[in-house]
Amino acid sequence: MNKRRILTFVMVVVLVGGLAAACAAPAPAPAPAPAPAPAPAPAQPAEVFEWEYQTLHPVGSATYAGFHLKLADLVKEMSGGRLILRVHPGNEIVPVYEQTEAVRDGVLDMAHSDLGAEMALVGKSALLLGASGYPAGTTCDEDFSWFYLGDGMDYASQVFEDYGLVIGCLPEGQEVFCYSHKPLATAADWDGVKMRTIGLWAEVLGTFGASVVTISGGEVYQSAEKGVIDAFEYAGPTVNWPMGFHEIMDYMGLPGIHSPGATHTIKVNRQSWSNLPADLQQILVVAIESLGNEFRTSLLINDSASLELYRDYGTNIFYVSDDFQAEIAKRTKEITLQYAADDPLFNEIWENKKAFVKTYKGGKTATTLNYSIYD
């Protein structure tokens, strides 16, 4: 009897509990999982700037491959492909001696030009800015130092203010005095000679009875081969050898008193420059300076080997007499002082550069050794 009551009681409790559970409020639903974060927007591709860059040099020149093409490769690598220089040899887009106007007009974004051919644009001050063809003038090392450590870059940008911005220079070394069909070692040898040259040397040479022709480097070989000119100068031994001048001229003159250094400026269009982000501007400036210094050093090393190529080929090498060199320097100084008297800006640049070179030479002279076990 007791067992039945206990069993009945248990069943009643279970039944009542079940009914209570059924009547209770439902348990709250679990909170929904948070929505996944939206996927990040795809990164926008970096803007790529493509520039047209024309040089002075033809394709066969050592400078074309050794500096200009290397500059394009270096800038592309340093910029991660954001700045592309499309390199063009001289005359491909515009005539060589119209490159500066083309930079001003936006036809070219950048150009490498010889200041010795640009007096008609900006006056005689251009000659002091490292121009090829300034007899007994500054060397490439002096010009390069003045540009980057002195006031050369600022003066260059001032002189060419209406045409673009000067952002660097390329030192190309001392030039060969000339290529010719006969020795031209004395003043008397030059009377009546048709000579291709540029710069102040053209004016000085005229005082010795020569007639001067100004043509681009890419036209020199053909003009000499056809007899349009009797003699010409272009660059140094390393740059000249691939041009094949030894094939058509029997004589080569040394030293290059007419052009101890040829330091060419690199100009950019102002709008193209302002469109570049600051980091790309810096990359281009640094690349030009670094590669310019490297190229200059390579010329110092290779010029000696290139002279041996001329000797092995059979080119007759003559040396300009000391008397003729002294007379060239004397007449150049007279013309320079007259330019300075007539032109205030020329005089300012002349005095500035003269003071810098004096300091440069003073330090170099004081530390130069007279003896070396490598001599």
Language-model segments: residues:
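Short, low-complexity disordered leader/linker segments with a strong preference
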Residues: 1-50, 368-375
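N-terminal secretory/targeting leader peptides
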Residues: 24-26, 43-143, 155-375
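Core domains of carbohydrate- and sulfate-ester-processing enzymes
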Residues: 150-151
